[in-house]
Amino acid sequence: MTRDLLARRERQALCDLALVLGEDAPTLSGDWTAKDLVTHLLLREHSLVGAPGLLIRPLSRLTDLEMARIGKKDFTVLVERLRGHGFTPYAIPAVDRAVNTLEYFVHHEDLRRAQPGWTSRDLDRADESALWSAIRVFGRGLVRPAGVPVRIRRTDTGAEATLRRGADPAVLTGMPQEIVMFLYGRNQHRGLGFTGPDKHIEALRTAGLGLSPSRHELLLRPHPAVVSCHDFG
């Protein structure tokens, strides 16, 4: 039996966990709560009014207003709305895989890893490889703030990828899921190793990787979805 895409399974798992933890649960996305996170994801996928502000700074005020409007809805209603793609480009498997694999994995982990006693998940090889394929692409933009050559290496297979070219790179080694969390600027990760020139390692570790919670979609999202924000009522 063919499994759903990792992006779709992570979407469902995020929704399940959000309901268990409740709307006020903390996340690793700045000071966002679980409800803020769910509201943001709905805006990203469904709002013609608010989504452009995630990309275009002068429109960010509209994004804030739309976040506030959507956030007035009942948390359970919002979570169940997020479970489905609706009539958006994200319902297309190729788009979902390209845009949402990291999106929903990172945000699911934002909920998981903000809780006391979290542990890394035992993902199978196929899921780790899906994360690896995605971070090889999006990681190039994520490491720009470091300003140094960067390579990543999987501990399970030994595969390597260059994220920023140059001599004497900082080499980040670990499981793909942990590499993803580090490159998205999350401070909750396990089992990572760093090799290379000390100054390059220091630059990578202190660069403030990832994007701020209000802007972290810039590298992930396609053109705004074609469903009107009025679907939220």
Regions found by a protein language model. Give the residues of each.
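Acidic catalytic motifs of isoprenoid enzymes
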Residues: 66-70
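An N-terminal domain-cap segment
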Residues: 1-53
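Structured surface interface patches that mediate subunit assembly and partner/cofactor docking
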Residues: 1-4, 20-24, 47-62, 77, ...
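Context-gated lysine
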Residues: 35, 72-73, 199
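Short, charged, amphipathic alpha-helices and their helix-cap/turn boundaries
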Residues: 7-16, 71-83
